[in-house]
């Protein structure tokens, strides 16, 4: 088979270059806010992940396997957060611990637009602070990260405690998680679908819907409003009590990142005060967020925010006419100057070399021919402006100033 497994993706040079630029911009924003990177293994022991994500994820979505030469069960990373909890228990970093991880994760989900089985996540988390300013910093940073990438996004924001208060008010506190999971499907199945499913488990379904539609401020704790008060761009915030994502582990503020015209969130996160200490048997407050790079690329290309115009990192192609060895030495001198240089390795004629350069869209040429060499010169050419210039070989550093 020449196709990769369903739900995974090959990245061509154009796509990989775009991916690298996106990651670089995200990292620059994360670092601006004082976050440092860590890297955890792509594979964990199954016992590390077991019991952390809920029954449905464990049975249907986690990639679990055992190799013939081992008796242990392993699993591919389902997210970046449980590995962070394991890392924290092992290394006990000084608090607050502000880390980011940009890595692949795996979920055996049904592939569709914007959804993959192997995908990249850019996570950032603050471990150790229970205060609203930590939550607000995550929201501010995520807004800035998306804007740096060219996206005009808005954040749907809510708080688990608000929905808990609402459900408690109608007398169904014991069914909170079950009710929250149904409410979380509002965007997919609509009000009528949610109402129908709620009626199957409670006789307070219509009252719940009524309260949800009112989106009442009374249910939100004061800590939530302190978070919102610290958000710099409040026009990017849409408070929505129907947002009920991840309440198996989120304990406070939750958010999702949306862009108009795209049918799923581009990222999300929230406060989870009961997870990080799960391995060290203590309560460690934490809040974080994640940028889904795969759907980000999909929607960015679709809306013209990104393009695949850049096909190579190569700045200069050294083109030779029957003088390969001399051209080889010149190419290496240019590399010593810090330039990215291509030289043909198939000993092709001038026409074939140029066909490759055009296909790869390499802008600058250094042409090495017998006549120029006799005068200790090379010809520098800008394919975009069509300008040509003779450069003495002893002054090759001049080329560096001509390359944009």
Swiss-Prot record:
- Signal peptide residues on this chain, from the entry's feature table: none
Record-linked Pfam families: HGTP_anticodon, tRNA-synt_His
Q: Which reaction does it catalyse?
A: tRNA(His) + L-histidine + ATP = L-histidyl-tRNA(His) + AMP + diphosphate + H(+)
According to the record, the segments passing through the membrane are: none
Q: What is its EC number?
A: 6.1.1.21
Instruction: Enumerate the UniProt keywords alphabetically.
Output: Aminoacyl-tRNA synthetase, ATP-binding, Cytoplasm, Ligase, Nucleotide-binding, Protein biosynthesis
Q: Which GO terms describe its cellular component?
A: cytosol
UniProt-recorded Gene Ontology molecular function terms:
ATP binding; histidine-tRNA ligase activity; RNA binding
GO biological process terms held by the UniProt record: histidyl-tRNA aminoacylation
Chief location bin: cytoplasm
Domain of life, source organism: Archaea
**Coiled coil, from the record:** none
Question: Mind telling me which InterPro entries this protein's record contains?
Answer: aa-tRNA-synth_II, aa-tRNA-synth_II/BPL/LPL, Anticodon-bd, Anticodon-bd_dom_sf, His-tRNA-ligase, HisRS-like_core, HisRS/HisZ
Which protein family is named in the record?
A: Belongs to the class-II aminoacyl-tRNA synthetase family.
Task: Supply the HAMAP family for this chain.
Answer: His_tRNA_synth
Q: What is this protein called?
A: Histidine--tRNA ligase
Organism equals Nanoarchaeum equitans (strain Kin4-M)
């Amino acid at each position: 088979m020449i196709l990769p497994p369903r739900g995974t993706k090959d990245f061509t040079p154009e796509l990989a270059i775009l991916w690298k630029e996106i990651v670089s911009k995200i990292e620059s924003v994360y670092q601006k806010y004082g976050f440092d990177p860590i890297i955890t293994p792509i594979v964990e022991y199954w016992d590390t992940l077991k019991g952390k994500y809920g029954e449905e994820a464990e049975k249907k979505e986690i990639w679990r396997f055992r190799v013939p030469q081992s008796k242990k069960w392993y699993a591919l990373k389902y997210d970046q957060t449980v590995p962070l909890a394991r890392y924290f228990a092992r290394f006990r970093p000084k608090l607050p611990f502000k880390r980011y991880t940009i890595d692949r994760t795996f979920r055996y989900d049904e592939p569709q637009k914007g959804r993959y089985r192997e995908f990249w996540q850019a996570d950032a988390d603050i471990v150790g602070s229970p205060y609203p300013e930590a939550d607000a910093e995550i929201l501010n940073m995520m807004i800035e990260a998306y804007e740096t990438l060219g996206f005009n996004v808005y954040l749907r924001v809510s708080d688990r405690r608000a929905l808990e208060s609402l459900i408690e008010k109608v007398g169904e506190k014991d069914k909170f998680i079950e009710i929250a999971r149904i409410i979380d499907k509002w965007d997919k199945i609509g009000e009528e679908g949610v109402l129908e499913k709620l009626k199957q488990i409670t006789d307070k379904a219509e009252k719940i819907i009524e309260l949800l539609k009112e989106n009442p401020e009374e249910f939100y704790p004061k800590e939530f409003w302190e978070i919102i008060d610290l958000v710099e761009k409040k026009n990017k915030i849409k408070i929505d009590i129907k947002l009920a994502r991840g309440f198996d582990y989120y304990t406070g503020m939750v958010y999702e990142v949306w862009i108009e015209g795209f049918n799923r969130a581009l990222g999300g996160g929230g406060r989870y005060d009961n997870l990080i200490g799960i391995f060290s048997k203590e309560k460690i407050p934490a809040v974080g967020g994640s940028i889904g790079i795969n759907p980000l690329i999909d929607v960015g290309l679709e809306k013209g925010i990104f393009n695949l115009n850049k096909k190579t990192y190569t700045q200069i192609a050294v083109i030779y006419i029957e003088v390969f060895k001399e051209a080889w030495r010149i190419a290496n001198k240019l590399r010593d100057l810090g330039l990215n240089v291509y030289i043909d390795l198939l000993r092709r004629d001038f026409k074939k070399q140029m066909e490759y350069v055009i296909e790869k869209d390499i802008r600058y040429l250094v042409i090495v021919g017998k006549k120029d060499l006799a005068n200790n010169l090379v010809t520098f050419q800008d394919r975009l402006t069509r300008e040509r210039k003779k450069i003495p070989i002893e002054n090759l550093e001049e080329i560096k100033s001509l390359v944009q």
